């Protein structure tokens, strides 16, 4: 079982190196290259200590999109000497969960190997689907890792939540997003290094601001921008502010006035203004203006002045 999984992972990585989106290819292979979330992944933190002691608990990763939830789950599985079974709550159901549980029981009986069940977007599973997981977390058949952008107390059933530690991930800082983008530009193996892209300082700032802490948004926009530019006579691809702004605006933004997206959009607008990024400010202002929030004639506070 472990050998087959290793072969699958090898083939997946080969494909990822050639065809997968940049954000997928740039997932860090180790904790040493993981950017941000040091309050969780730091060498002296609880999660790392549990890994070192081979006492990994079931836990839930709660945080905004692009903050590293899926990457962290994969990294945790590497040193845990366990079979890693990932599913998405969007595309999987009870039959998939029961199949994984059956394989976990077989691994446990025949190979004395643990199984990590990783459920991405656990909030998309209803109560009945979450109930299927519950007894197998209780008896230790699986170590459960869930990832969600929603408040766990509202979306995860209480019995399952009571058996899990909740780790809260933060949106990546502008410095962290900038580091990830720069790494992608120079990485010749999984990044864009072979394309010799040169990102103008203003373009990098715009990319970081509009990404608003989401590394996936930044990397996807970067990849779009780089491939939108033809190399010059020297083989260089010059990426200016206009190209980056265009790449960012091709993204369909998620905006929900009733949820956190409303406040995230206002936050991104304020950061763009304070960061002296007119293109970014106009982008987020237009998004606010064309939303239902405009009907409320809302105003935002910018350093003591309301607009």
Where are these regions (language model features)?
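Walker A/P-loop
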Residues: 8-10, 51-52, 56-86
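Pre-Walker A (pre-P-loop) alpha-helix and adjacent loop at the N terminus of AAA/AAA+ ATPase modules
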Residues: 17-58
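Short glycine-rich substrate-engagement loop in P-loop NTPases that contacts/grips substrate
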Residues: 87-113
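Conserved AAA+ ATPase "SRH/arginine-finger" region at the nucleotide-binding site
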Residues: 166-177
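Short conserved motifs of the RecA-like P-loop NTPase core
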Residues: 194-210, 265
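C-terminal helical "lid" of AAA+/P-loop NTPase domains
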Residues: 205-209, 216-230
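Conserved C-terminal helix/linker of AAA+ ATPases
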Residues: 229-250
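Conserved small/polar residues in nucleotide/adenosyl-binding loops
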Residues: 289-296
């Amino acid at each position: 079982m472990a050998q087959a999984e290793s072969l699958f992972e090898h083939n997946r990585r080969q494909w990822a190196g050639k065809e997968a989106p940049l954000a997928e290819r740039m997932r860090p292979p180790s904790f040493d290259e993981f950017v941000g979330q040091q309050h969780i992944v730091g060498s002296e933190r609880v999660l790392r200590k549990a890994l070192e002691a081979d006492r990994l608990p079931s836990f839930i990763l709660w945080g905004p999109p692009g903050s590293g939830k899926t990457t962290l789950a994969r990294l945790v599985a590497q040193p845990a000497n366990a079979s890693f079974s990932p599913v998405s709550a969007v595309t999987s159901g009870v039959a998939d969960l029961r199949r994984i549980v059956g394989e976990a029981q077989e691994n446990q009986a025949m190979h004395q190997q643990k199984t990590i069940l990783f459920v991405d977007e656990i909030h998309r599973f209803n109560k009945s689907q979450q109930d299927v997981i519950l007894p197998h977390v209780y008896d230790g058949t699986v170590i459960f890792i869930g990832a969600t952008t929603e408040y766990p107390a509202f979306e995860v059933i209480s019995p399952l939540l009571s058996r899990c530690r909740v780790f809260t991930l933060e949106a990546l800082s502008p410095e962290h997003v900038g580091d990830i983008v720069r790494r992608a530009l120079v990485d010749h193996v999984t990044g864009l290094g072979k394309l010799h892209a040169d990102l103008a300082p203003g373009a990098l700032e715009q990319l970081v601001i509009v990404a608003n802490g989401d590394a996936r948004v930044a990397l996807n926009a970067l990849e779009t921008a780089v491939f939108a530019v033809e190399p010059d006579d020297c083989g260089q691809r010059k990426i200016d502010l206009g190209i980056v702004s265009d790449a960012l605006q091709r993204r369909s933004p998620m905006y929900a006035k009733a949820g956190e997206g409303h406040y995230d959009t206002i936050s991104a607008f304020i950061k763009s203004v304070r960061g002296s990024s007119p293109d970014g400010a106009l982008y987020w202002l237009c998004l606010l203006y064309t939303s239902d929030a405009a009907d409320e004639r809302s105003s935002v506070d910018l350093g003591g002045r309301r607009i």
